[in-house]
Amino acid sequence: MKTNRAYSTLEVKALDDEKRVITGIASTPSPDRMQDVVEPKGAQFKLPIPFLWQHNHDEPIGHVTEAKVTQKGIEVSVQLTQVEEPGKLKDRLDEAWQSIKSGLVRGLSIGFSAKEFEQIPGSWGLRFLSWEWFELSAVTIPANAEATITSVKSIDREQRAALGIKSVPVVRVTPAGASAIKTKTIKVPKPQEGNDMKTTAEQIAEFEATRVTKAAEMEAIMTKAAEAGETLDAEQSEQFDTLEAEIAAIDKHIGRLKQMQKAQAANAKPVTEEAGAQRMANVKALDFKEVQVRAKNTQKLEPGIAFARAAKCLALGHLEHRDAIGIAKSLYDGQDSIIAATQRLVTKAAVAAATTSDATWAGPLVGDETSVFADFVEYLRPQTILGRFGTNGIPSLRRVPFRVPLIGQTSGGDGYWVGEGQAKPLTKFDFERKTLEPLKVANIAVATMEVIRDSSPSADVIIRDQLAAALRERLDIDFIDPAKAAVAGVSPASILNGVAGIPSSGNTADDVRADIRALFNAFIAANNAPTSGVWLMPATTALALSLMQNPLGQAEFPGISMTGGTLFGLPVIVSEYIPTASAGAVVALVNASDIYLGDEGGVDLSMSTEASLQMDNAPDNPTTASTVLVSLWQRNLVGFRAERAINWARRRASAVAYLTGVNWGAA
């Protein structure tokens, strides 16, 4: 049985005695972003209804205790459970309550099963006429544009006011988000039109009389609630808060008038008719006091999440035939970097490459929108062999720009002893010229439309990880696989390609030391000391080394573990993509300073829902009669194509040496 969801507005009230209650509208007759309409009058339910956290059925946080169908929707009252015993349940309940109270979670969503529905003319949406209500959830980002928390209040505020105790602060969350501008206008009393400007003393008297009137109105509101034995409802609370704010403004204004009265008494001067008219105009201009408050969203996201959210906005815009930039503004209001990155994806403005003809070489790498792309690249780098160079004490590869000639000396000249009057011999120096051209590595990651539309943070993580995984495997395999040869204009050769491997001598600790000595000897024979040497090996090989023990039961190679470490004083990088065959694995020693790396630091992203794909990591090119294609449109899938410009090359042949058939530690 399919469970549907609909979203609506929520008003939260907090009790000082820890009795957590939420009131709000669980369903409205307005269409959501999916263009569906859920008719409140068609609801079938039985109280109490489970109240869940983010639609997770294994994370209940309370019950719906009251539900009333009205013209505006289904008005609900929700009781959040509270426990005293420490544990995961208490942590979840406290987190849910604090998230709702602080405004981080601002929407309600109903889970239901459709019994009767019809197509809405001129729309892809459905109108659910009869439906069975299963659960209600608090959600972070609702699909309905109206589904936001309107206010967060404490009922204890009214209880304290009734007892004459100073009230606690009120936290308000604006419907547009944390970064929206909220303007509160308080009108102060002024003389009636047609009357002459009153003196300062008359103004003070009038304001004091107005204050008494408003204080009496506040007292009447509280008296009425006390006689009925009830707390203030939403309308009474708003009226009470407004009166309280106006009295505070009047008190400040009276204080200013009294200060002005003292100054006038000390500096009394004749006032002309023109000056009086000007003063009247100035006072009228100050009748309204406006205060604007803007809070900028400074939430620190996990690496790569900002880029994933920009990609999701691009996909949602395509799926729903809406402006992707507008979706980014509505979902992530205040997060300017995500909005700017979405705009960059929509306009297909590629991240500029570094070239020698560009006077502002580093300019394209600065800015909010490009920082999102760089953030994703920085998330991807530590997951690749290439990206681990230059981090955590590991030497860096030699970074070079694209299309710039690299001149290297391959052999030196000779000097000669020359006798008196004899001809001086000539000598010859050998040089080579290399240029790294930008080559593109690309792959396609596929996600379901349900994941794209999911508003939970975990959905953003799924998109980010799929985009990263699309590039990580190819980069690692082609960088280290000895069999990978260069394809002109397409891909670079592996740094081990064309270098003869050294067969491993055995499995024991002594054999390991002999193998290591053989690798070092290869560098010594070429007069190229591996001062920036780095070991590359599979994680299983590193694990086998860490498990080897000497006769005393101590670790034979204590500096290494399955995640890396050091071996004979040099750092170790492990990867699951380093070649491993039945005969054994490959272990390489790489002199990092002898490897050229060109990396512009950018990534290009495109998406489609109509393409047909070969769900294969080695697609036919061109396709044949036996090629099986999968339609993204037919299966509700979204394809993301990610591309990076990158290239590498050995500086010299002696930059690397490697072992083959390694089975260290095997029985």
UniProtKB/Swiss-Prot annotation:
Gene3D superfamilies noted in UniProt: hypothetical protein PF0899 domain, Major capsid protein gp5
Domain of life: Viruses
GO biological process, one term: proteolysis
Entry's EC annotation: 3.4.-.-
Pfam families in alphabetical order: Peptidase_S78, Phage_capsid
Start and end residues of each stretch annotated as Prohead protease activity: 8-154
An example molecular function term from Gene Ontology annotations: peptidase activity
GO CC annotation, single: T=7 icosahedral viral capsid
Modification(s) after translation: The prohead protease may be autocatalytically cleaved giving rise to the mature capsid protein.
NCBIfam families xrefs: major_cap_HK97
Protein name: Capsid polyprotein
Species the sequence originates in: Pseudomonas phage PAJU2
